[in-house]
C-alpha cells in the first residue's frame, strides 16, 4: 500500500509557495504506515509536498510502485489544513484515476471525517476512512477491497457496479485507538 501526501502549496499559497511556505512532515501518514507495518502489511510513503513533484511525475511514481491501495492522507497540524490539503489530493487523485482507473484510491483526514459523503461522491475516490482510520484501514486491508466491505467498520465505499450506478455507503463507526493500546497499535506515536 502507498500512503500519499499530496502537494497543495502552490494552489494554496501561490507565489509564496516557492520560498516561504513551510513543508509540513506527513506525521499522520508516518503513523499509519508504521501501524500497518507492525501488522505485517507492506507500505511505502510518497511525500509530493517535500519532493515538490509535478502532477505527472507523482502519477508516474505512484504507478511505478503498483500499490494494492493508494491512501491519500490529508491531515495537518492546523485543524483546517485537511480542507486545504484536499486541493492537491483531489487534483492528484483525479489524474491518477483517469490514467489508472482500476487503482483503488482511499482518503483519510480531518476533511474526510467531517464530510465523508461529500468526499466519497468524488468520482476518483473509492474508499474513505473515518476518524483516525487505524483499525478501519487494518480491517480493510484484510479484504480483497471488493467483497465483504459492509463488515468493515469505520469505512465508506461505493457499492454496486462502477461508474454512475454506484451508491455511497458509510459503515458504522470504528473505535479510535485507546490510550492503553497506543504502543501496540500506533508504534512511534510519541
Pin down the residues of each PLM region.
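Acidic, low-complexity intrinsically disordered segments
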Residues: 1-190
Amino acid at each position: 500500500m502507498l500512503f500519499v501526501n499530496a502537494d497543495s502549496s502552490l494552489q494554496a499559497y501561490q507565489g509564496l509557495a516557492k520560498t516561504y511556505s513551510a513543508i509540513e512532515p506527513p506525521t499522520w501518514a508516518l503513523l499509519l504506515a508504521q501501524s500497518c507495518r507492525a501488522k505485517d502489511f507492506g507500505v511505502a510513503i510518497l511525500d509530493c509536498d517535500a519532493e515538490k513533484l509535478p502532477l505527472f511525475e507523482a502519477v508516474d511514481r505512484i504507478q511505478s510502485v503498483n500499490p494494492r491501495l493508494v491512501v491519500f492522507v490529508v491531515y495537518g497540524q492546523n485543524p483546517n489544513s485537511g480542507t486545504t490539503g484536499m486541493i492537491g489530493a483531489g487534483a492528484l487523485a483525479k489524474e491518477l484515476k483517469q490514467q489508472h482507473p482500476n487503482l483503488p484510491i482511499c482518503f483519510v483526514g480531518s476533511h474526510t471525517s467531517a464530510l465523508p459523503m461529500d468526499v466519497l461522491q468524488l468520482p476518483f475516490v473509492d474508499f474513505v476512512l473515518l476518524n483516525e482510520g487505524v483499525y478501519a484501514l487494518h480491517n480493510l486491508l484484510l479484504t480483497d477491497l471488493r467483497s465483504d466491505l459492509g463488515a468493515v467498520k469505520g469505512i465508506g465505499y461505493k457499492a454496486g457496479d462502477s461508474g454512475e450506478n454506484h451508491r455511497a455507503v458509510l459503515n458504522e463507526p470504528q473505535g479510535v485507538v485507546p490510550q492503553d493500546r497506543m504502543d501496540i497499535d500506533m508504534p512511534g506515536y510519541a
